[in-house]
């Protein structure tokens, strides 16, 4: 009986851990260039539990994502640390925080960045969650009118420069 009970407890704990964790380690950043303003509008989707863990690790204190007054400054700093944009001239562009939206499973982070000259020749680096997961995949979906390009960043990718399509 004790053996059966311990197997049931082990099974329950295993199922609970499996349900909590997600096998897919992915962030998606939608980046749309606004020609009228000369700014790149960013929408970053991250798994809520991963972001909470990353913000807590980054700040050294627990950052609950359901507390906007704690989430905004921590997420803004995290975004600036893990997403860099350089103009075609090589100048690092400063991100302006626009806000966040929390759902049951994801958090959307919003920001804008000036990008003189547009996407072609701009350089990007995206390192979300690399401090937590060596198999993290970060997708950056770029749009400027009819121009669309998807850049993929894994641990060690470094910077990627946008080139015109041939």
Which residues does each predicted region cover?
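Hydrophobic h-region of N-terminal signal peptides that target proteins for export
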Residues: 12-21
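N-terminal soluble domains immediately following signal/targeting peptides that reside
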Residues: 22-166
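Absolute protein N-terminus
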Residues: 1, 21-22
């Amino acid at each position: 009986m004790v053996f059966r009970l311990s197997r049931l407890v082990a099974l329950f704990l295993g199922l609970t851990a499996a349900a909590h964790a997600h096998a897919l380690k992915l962030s998606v950043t939608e980046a749309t260039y606004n020609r009228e303003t000369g700014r790149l509008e960013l929408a970053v989707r991250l798994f809520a539990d991963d972001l909470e863990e990353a913000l807590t690790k980054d700040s050294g204190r627990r950052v609950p994502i359901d507390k906007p007054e704690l989430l905004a400054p921590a997420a803004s700093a995290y975004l600036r640390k893990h997403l860099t944009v350089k103009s075609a001239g090589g100048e690092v562009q400063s991100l302006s925080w626009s806000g966040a939206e929390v759902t049951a499973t994801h958090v959307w982070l919003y920001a804008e960045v000036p990008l003189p000259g547009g996407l072609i020749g701009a350089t990007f680096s995206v390192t979300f969650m690399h401090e937590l997961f060596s198999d993290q995949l970060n997708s950056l979906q770029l749009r400027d009118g009819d121009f669309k390009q998807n850049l993929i960043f894994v641990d060690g990718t470094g910077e990627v420069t946008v080139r015109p399509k041939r």
